[in-house]
Amino acid sequence: MKQEFEGFDFTNFWDDNYYARKEYISDAPTDELIADVEKELGYKLPASYIWLMKQHNGGIPFNTCFPTDSPTNWAEDHIAITGIYGIGREKDYSLCGEIGSQFMIDEWGYPEIGVAICDCPSAGHDMIFLDYRECGPFGEPKVVHIDQESDFKITTLAENFEDFIRGLENA
């Protein structure tokens, strides 16, 4: 069986500042909460995402940039994230929170391709999603950037969530 994030050092991964604790970080999700959230969202969350959220449920990483081959409205060669949504409902920036995945689809018009997992510094004008279009609701989704300012242009960032986390770089 594959070990999630084998060899990856999370020692200095998270920036547990006041804002992160207030808006993003929740207690580790129970299996029951995970099942409830998956049912509400209509998608099976990737094992690597669940594993990471059981270690640290949401938050702001120190490394917030992911390189891209094509320019975005944010930069010529990368996207930036503000934080990673945790599994839950109680924090505004959690999967089923006040500003969670369904809110971004319903209120901001993001395409229904999967689950919003990261917000970006643009305050809603671009987001990071788990993209289930190719794999279906129970498969292993890709991680994509969706740019609202460019007619919801979708750019693939990583083949899976673990590769996305491993690819984050310092600004």
Place the predicted regions along the sequence by residue.
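Low-complexity, glycine/alanine/valine/leucine- and proline-rich hydrophobic stretches
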Residues: 128-136
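Short active-site-adjacent structural elements
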Residues: 125-128, 153-154
